[in-house]
């Protein structure tokens, strides 16, 4: 019975991102759930910038309220707290998600706040590794991952007419510099800035666990970004396509992304053009073991003074063992295939392997 339960639970955990959110309140159409995890995590690497303790905790709240038969309000907040430094250290906690919205029956939903960019609707399919992965893009990287000030419209099953056909439309306001003409109230460094932008995604669950998706995003770039060593242009564009198979204990996913002035090249700026590729494969055994293998590559084209260079390139081999729905342990080995050269050194890109070992309690 235990192995049967595990075989049903684990895929659900991977999709939901939480093992079994604790229901705090559910009465009169109002519901509030608490979820989170504590990851006792250690990295082993020759790269002294990452080697050592990486323990952290995440905590989130999801709520919804039934306004009438067709209208539901909802909100979500998620927070990350690092636990690998002294109690007096700074910059050890931050908000990952914070948004509120309304769902209008089959007409779709609209929300605003800090949320995932629509490009992640497709690239998330390969972001399933035990520890690493999902790093041909990053947070606060236009609409490629978590981002500030995004207004998102989502529609599931195409107004209730086509099962499995989902689409989204998104707008992001400017997040500029700390001071000067391009300043905004939440100013940040050039690599994290963005001008006004929009994006869209379409995903379709075709049949028998097979899904396909496409996403596009276009954002204005800031003056600060165009003053960086790499990357020049008025706009940052992202085109993404992906395929996924998730059935019969097998998980296979791949995505290809082509960007223009949108993929970070370490600390130097943005690649004028980049080709990003990720593929991941996993198998869920009934007794709780989930081995994983993946390949990720981001290649920058025509990098000023450096030509074509790999920005990221590695093979990932790992495994997770689920004791039950709340407790798991994992090992993840990142086999770095980058060469140590003038570009990686100038950009501050590590070329060392990393092994991650973690013990996780989640709820």
Swiss-Prot record:
Keyword Transferase appears in the UniProt entry: no
Pfam families: Porin_1 (PF00267)
InterPro entries for this protein: Gram-neg_bact_OMP (IPR050298), Porin_dom_sf (IPR023614), Porin_gammaproteobac (IPR001897), Porin_Gram-ve (IPR001702), Porin_Gram-ve_CS (IPR013793)
Topological type in the membrane: Multi-pass membrane protein
One of the record's GO cellular component terms: pore complex
Primary localization: membrane
Described purpose of this protein according to its UniProt entry: Forms pores that allow passive diffusion of small molecules across the outer membrane. In K.pneumoniae it has been shown to bind the C1Q component and activate the classical pathway of the complement system.
PANTHER family from the UniProt entry: OUTER MEMBRANE PORIN C (PTHR34501:SF1), PROTEIN YDDL-RELATED (PTHR34501)
UniProt name for this protein: Outer membrane porin C
Organism: Klebsiella pneumoniae
């Amino acid at each position: 019975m235990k192995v049967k339960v595990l075989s049903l639970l684990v895929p659900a955990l991977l999709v939901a991102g939480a093992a079994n959110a604790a229901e705090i309140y559910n009465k009169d159409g109002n519901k509030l759930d608490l979820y989170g995890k504590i990851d006792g995590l250690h990295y082993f690497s020759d790269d002294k910038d990452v080697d050592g303790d990486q323990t952290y905790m995440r905590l989130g709240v999801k709520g919804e309220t039934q306004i009438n038969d067709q209208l539901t309000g909802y909100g979500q907040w998620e927070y990350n707290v690092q636990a690998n430094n002294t109690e007096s250290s700074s910059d050890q906690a931050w908000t990952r998600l914070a948004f509120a919205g309304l769902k209008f029956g089959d007409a779709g939903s609209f929300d605003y706040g800090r949320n995932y960019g629509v490009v992640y609707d497709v690239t998330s399919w390969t972001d399933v590794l035990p520890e690493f992965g999902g790093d041909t893009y990053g947070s606060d990287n236009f609409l490629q991952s978590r981002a500030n000030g995004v207004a998102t419209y989502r529609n599931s099953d195409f107004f209730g007419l086509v099962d499995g056909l989902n689409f989204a439309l998104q707008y992001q306001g400017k997040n500029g510099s700390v001071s000067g003409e391009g300043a905004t109230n939440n100013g940040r460094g050039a690599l994290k800035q963005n001008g006004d932008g929009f994006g869209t995604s379409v995903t379709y669950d075709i049949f028998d666990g097979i899904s396909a998706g496409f996403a596009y995003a276009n954002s204005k770039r800031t003056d600060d970004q165009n003053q960086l060593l790499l990357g020049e242009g008025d706009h940052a564009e992202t085109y993404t396509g992906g395929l996924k198979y998730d059935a019969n204990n097998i998980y296979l996913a791949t995505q290809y992304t082509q960007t223009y002035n949108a993929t970070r090249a370490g600390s130097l700026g943005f690649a004028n053009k980049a080709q990003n590729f990720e593929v991941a494969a996993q198998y869920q055994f009934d007794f709780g073991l989930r081995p994983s293998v993946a390949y990720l590559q981001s290649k920058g084209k025509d990098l000023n003074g450096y030509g074509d260079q790999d920005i990221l390139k590695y093979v990932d081999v790992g495994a997770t063992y689920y004791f039950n729905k709340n407790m798991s342990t994992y090992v993840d080995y990142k086999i770095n295939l980058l060469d140590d050269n003038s570009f990686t050194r100038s950009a501050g890109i590590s070329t060392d392997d990393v092994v991650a070992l973690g013990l996780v309690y989640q709820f």
